[in-house]
Amino acid sequence: MSTSVSFARDTPTSNATLMRKYDAVAYAAKSNALSHPDHIAVVATLFGLDPADVATCRVLELGCSDGANLLPMAASLTDASFVGCDLSPRAITAARSAVAELGLSNVALFEGDLSAMPETLGDFDYMIAHGVYSWVPATVRDALFALARRRLKRNGILFVSYNVYPGCHVRKAVWESLHLHVERIEGASARLDAARAFAAALAEPGTTQNPIDALLRHEFRQVTQITDSALYHDDLAEPNDPVYFHELASPRRQNGDRNALRAQRVTISVLSPRRSFR
């Protein structure tokens, strides 16, 4: 039987704002093969780590949304156990419905802030934070790694995906211009329409041969083609903060968190710069 529990309902203002945004426009979650424990375990082994047996592992996904990534894992690994956590009541409700429809008995779902997850959940062999790190406040980022330090088992693996510099510098320029254009516009639908119209205008072919102009036009053209979900929760999201790898790794090294650092090295080695993280 799946577990359905709410916790930390008195979330900070920043988290409450994030929760409202995800309830205003549903995030179209999808599965990500790179975050599957089987894939993580293989790559981790190649890097000299000794990960847990995937068949009987314990997995925690932070920001599980409606379960599109977590539930297929649970359905295929019936002797493993899975826990999903998300701020959005709308997403967790959808995930619970899917668990019931699929008849899964190895899934527990929690609605609330990851920094206040109950100790009764136990420890985990694999922790997944896909499409979370770059889109949450600094306090939540710190809480993510603090949780990993407390709750990862020996030889546990933390999978983190995030927007990374220097590759995101051009995209960041596009995101900032979109933000400036829509900052005074109220309502999700109106903001989406305005952002698309703005991007379409700037994607029009220009007369210059400047390669930077061509690159920017390409990025604006991409904005006109992505889904409302991706535009609202990625390009128009606040925060949306890419980081350099050393910014992610250095604090973990200073805290003596060698396993998290090694896991980050594994993760960054298998994520192509052309892949969409979310």
Where are these regions (language model features)?
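Conserved SAM/SAH-binding beta-strand->alpha-helix loop
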Residues: 88-89
